[in-house]
Amino acid sequence: MSGGGHGAEAAVAEVLERGRTDPAAAHVFTRTYAADALAAARAADVAAPGPERPLAGLPVTIKDLFDVAGETTLSGTSVRRGLPAAEADAVVVARLRRSGAAITGRTNMVEYAFGGVGLNPHLGTPRNPADPNVARVPGGSSSGAAVSVGLGLAVAAVGSDTAGSVRIPAALC
């Protein structure tokens, strides 16, 4: 986000556009939420600031390992396409929504969160933002989450960590 005194809606629109058009952002997202993110940012622009919405209007991404109501969680694999949709948001997703975050998308990951390099042959591997013109691994399994922050497509990202799944990509990106 470039700042410059514009509101949350303009900043989120800028981030969404960059995510859609920047070649370095290829394979970062498995799904984006432009309309919902812009609505959350618009609400932040008109609401009075308060402690109950500490993330009001800030662009945040979530790893495609956490359920979003009405959607199938892919967990980094195409095999899960067509499986039943989640009935409710994961707790972390529900809390982000309540905090006012503008959730811009679900991020790509290593298949079933099993791997530290960050490669995904099924859904594509996000490019390491440290040098997107060179084939450098982003680390995993929360590869898309780290890349979304590294490219400035989010101010924060939700990942998961069992054996370095957030720490490795955070260090590499």
PLM segments and residue spans:
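Gly/Ser-rich catalytic/binding loops embedded in alpha/beta enzyme cores
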Residues: 1-158, 162
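Cytochrome P450 heme-iron axial ligand motif
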Residues: 165
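Structural signature of FAD isoalloxazine-binding scaffolds in flavoprotein oxidoreductases
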Residues: 168-173
